[in-house]
């Protein structure tokens, strides 16, 4: 029993995170030097994301009997994404108004370090809706794979899958090659995942060493408020959706616990993407559904990021005594419904989208972003965890709606001890 526990990736990552926290707290300088371990692990994962998405989507689409099924899957997924992410935005808005974590801080925006957020503001200015849509189309296929842009690779994979399906029997040899290549890629992923504890240790040691546990106290109310909101969202909103679909959210969380710990250690939901594709297939979801829903969800179904965006924006207003009436808050909500859809397509993710939103709304002081900058790293864990759970639930829901779910298989893996 003890030997099996030590071999468990779940236990190894949990132990690594604990050691990382202790090292960062007691030896901060040494902790900050561990950063390359976390960065290296995330880079290794990103290295295989593009090929794994390509193989999964192409074999999933090309292997389907009807092309109408692909269109139906995509349409159901997008409707689901829009509804659930809107609920997440509204919940974030309600909680931050009720709890008011920024009230009483009385911060003068002119005293904040504008230089600290200028880089994010510049990137945000480039991130318009038209620019985002055009960015989905790669300048070249090789460029899409080289940059690791998920949506660009996904677009090419969908087109490739459709074209391969139309070839019929002539395309069978190509299909077999890609299917075989996908097995090789998943073999590489299994090797990389052995380094997950090392990556989680390095990332956590750096975070605590650089920012310190004590720095959280001043802005801790927002962090606590955000974490509680994410937990309630997962339990009640995603839990209700899961129950209506016929499974338990708690059993599902237990099923993906290793992936959640990897995300917790690295603060990157991308680090678990390849394993999630494999796990969702093993849970009874058809490959074609998994290949479309999971990668697309990384840009269109970011529940944790949606909660973060509304809470952070209103927090800045409260902290700087900027009055936001119902009209301003509805405007903020509408802008976020559009801007939040590009959150995973930009470097810096949620923070840059937040800067873009504040610039678009115009009512909030852009300098107020400096308040969030210092604690953004600590909020990223809850964002990434909520995003991962949300995309997993979405995959099962869409698979069931499209009649592409083996419910017997799902119950078997979720109830396994």
From Swiss-Prot:
One of its GO terms (cellular component) is plasma membrane. Keywords: Cell inner membrane, Cell membrane, Membrane, Symport, Transmembrane, Transmembrane helix, Transport. It comes from the Bacteria. The chain crosses the membrane at residues 8-28, 44-64, 76-96, 142-162, 184-206, 222-242, 326-346, 352-372. It is found in: Cell inner membrane. Its main location: membrane. GO terms for biological process: L-aspartate transmembrane transport. The keyword Transmembrane helix applies. GO terms for molecular function: fumarate transmembrane transporter activity; malate:proton symporter activity; succinate transmembrane transporter activity. The keyword Cell membrane applies. Belongs to the dicarboxylate/amino acid:cation symporter (DAACS) (TC 2.A.23) family. Responsible for the transport of dicarboxylates such as succinate, fumarate, and malate from the periplasm across the membrane. This is C4-dicarboxylate transport protein. It comes from Photorhabdus laumondii subsp. laumondii (strain DSM 15139 / CIP 105565 / TT01) (Photorhabdus luminescens subsp. laumondii).
């Amino acid at each position: 029993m003890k030997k099996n526990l030590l071999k468990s990736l779940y236990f190894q990552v949990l132990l690594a995170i604990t050691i990382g926290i202790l090292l960062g707290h007691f030896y901060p300088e040494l902790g900050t030097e561990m950063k390359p371990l976390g960065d290296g692990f995330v880079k290794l994962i990103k290295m295989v994301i593009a090929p794994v998405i390509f193989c999964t989507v192409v074999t999933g689409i090309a292997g389907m009997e009807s092309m109408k099924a692909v269109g139906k899957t995509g349409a159901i997924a997008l409707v689901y994404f829009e509804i659930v992410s809107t609920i997440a935005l509204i919940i974030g808005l309600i909680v931050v108004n009720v709890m008011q974590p920024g009230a009483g801080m009385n911060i003068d925006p002119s005293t904040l370090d504008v230089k600290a957020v200028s880089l994010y503001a510049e990137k945000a200015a480039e991130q318009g809706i038209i620019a985002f849509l055009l960015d989905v189309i790669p300048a070249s296929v090789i460029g899409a794979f080289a940059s690791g842009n998920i949506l660009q690779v996904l677009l090419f994979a969908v087109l490739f899958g459709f074209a391969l399906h139309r070839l019929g029997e002539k395309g069978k040899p190509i299909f077999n090659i890609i299917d075989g290549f996908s097995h090789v890629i998943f073999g590489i992923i299994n090797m990389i995942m052995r380094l997950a504890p090392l990556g989680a240790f390095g990332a956590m040691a750096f975070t605590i060493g650089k920012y310190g546990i004590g720095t959280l106290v001043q802005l801790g109310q927002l962090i606590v408020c955000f974490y509680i909101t994410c937990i309630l969202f997962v339990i009640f909103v995603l839990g209700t959706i899961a129950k209506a679909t016929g499974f338990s959210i708690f059993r599902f969380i237990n099923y993906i616990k290793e992936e959640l710990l990897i995300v917790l250690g690295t603060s990157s939901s991308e680090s678990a993407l390849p394993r999630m594709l494999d796990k969702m297939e093993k849970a009874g979801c058809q490959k074609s559904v998994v290949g479309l829903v999971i990668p697309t969800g990384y840009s269109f179904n970011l529940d944790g990021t949606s909660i973060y965006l509304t809470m952070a924006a209103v927090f800045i207003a409260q902290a700087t005594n900027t009055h936001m009436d119902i009209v301003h808050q509805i405007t903020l909500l509408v802008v976020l419904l559009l801007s939040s859809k590009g959150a995973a397509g930009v470097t810096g993710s949620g923070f840059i989208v937040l800067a873009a939103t504040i610039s678009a709304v115009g009512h909030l002081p852009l300098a107020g972003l400096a308040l969030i900058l210092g604690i953004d790293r600590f909020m990223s864990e809850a964002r990434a965890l909520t995003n991962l759970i949300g995309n997993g639930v979405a995959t099962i829901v869409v698979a069931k709606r499209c009649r592409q779910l083996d419910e017997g298989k799902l119950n078997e893996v979720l109830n396994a001890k």
